[in-house]
Amino acid sequence: MSQLFYNNETISRIIKSQFDMALSHYGDIKYAYMVLNKKKPTEILIISNHHDEWREIYQANNYQHIDPVVIAALNKITPFPWDEDLLVSTQLKMSKIFNLSREHNITNGYTFVLHDHSNNLVMLSIMIDESNVSNIDDVIESNKDKLQMTLMTIHAETISLYREMIRNKEDERSNDKDIFSQRENEILYWASMGKTYQEIALILDIKTGTVKFHIGNVVKKLGVLNAKHAIRLGIELQLIRPVQS
């Protein structure tokens, strides 16, 4: 399985919070961030602020195989609206996926597309209900370049976090004696020295989200409530190895 499709809950929370923050500037927007393995379309990652039921039904039924938006996006490199031409061209106007969409008050939308270097189809779909079509359409048209850049930037963060997860697992396999991976230890060490997440990210040349991801793993490993408890316990039990600056 490709590294992006492990559906790590911590990573999904981080990515969702980044989309929530980035898209909040444009109003009350419902969105779905989707990553599809083009070589193996059953592998799919969906992060959304829409109803969990919608996402669960979509994934359980593998609706990506019949979704007109996905089918259209496979052959596009620029953003596109969900219009009548899309429905006609895919010949799926009465498909199950549109029945599902109507049930969850999704009547229109706009999708931003990215084809990444790992052969994944990456989409950010803005979902629009009937009561807010004109307002959201105007916002999207005025900010298409910014929304496309948002997708590119946050997808790069997704890739970075999953690479760190894989590296973390490899570190654990290579050194079973240490409770923390090399990266976790580095982050915990600098945190114990009073550095903020932003400062640690600069020191280690990684993203702030990556720091938060590893701190989350440390908290789980130690069975404590939060990062402050983890740092204090790491110091008290001498679990943190010195790091050369």
Curated annotation (Swiss-Prot):
CDD domains: LuxR_C_like. One of its GO terms (molecular function) is DNA binding. GO terms for biological process: quorum sensing; regulation of DNA-templated transcription. Residues 197-216 bind DNA. Transmembrane segments: none annotated. It comes from the Bacteria. Belongs to the autoinducer-regulated transcriptional regulatory protein family. This is Transcriptional activator protein ExpR. It comes from Pectobacterium parmentieri. The gene is expR.
